[in-house]
Amino acid sequence: DHRFRDLKTLAQQYPDKLQASVIQFYLFEADFSLMLAKKAISSGDRYYLSGHIFRMVSALNQVIFAKNKVYFLNEKKAIKRIDRFEFAPSKYEDRINEIFGSLYEEGGPTIGLLEVLLADVQNLISFY
């Protein structure tokens, strides 16, 4: 049926307006989550802190998928996929694992790692 084929062809394309909207929304979301993570550090509540870190990374994943015009379906294996994208921060998976691994270390996660990661994604968006 040609109607199904036509719809399938349309769905395979990633619209520019969707890309711009996803990038704008989720960059804000990542920045907002980073701000809340910074506040949560001093509380010692690692559950609350880890929630904001997960939220920030999930938002960055959305941005990177959109930059590459790939539909984001879920978090499963997202960071592995990102490392293979044309537009991606270097060693993304390793950096994310380092951030989450630091939750269990004395002093908790380094906010600096999150700040640098966000800046790298912002540069990725503005550079290309």
Predicted regions and their residues:
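Terminal (often C-terminal) interaction modules
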Residues: 37, 88-128
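Amphipathic alpha-helical interaction surfaces
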Residues: 36, 59-66, 70, 88, ...
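Conserved NTP/Mg2+-binding pocket subregion across the NTase superfamily
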Residues: 1-41
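A nucleotide- and high-energy phosphate-metabolite-utilizing enzyme signature
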Residues: 20-26, 75, 122-125
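Short, charged amphipathic alpha-helical segments flanked by flexible coils
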Residues: 68-97
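Small-residue-rich helix-loop
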Residues: 52-59, 64, 75-76, 80-81
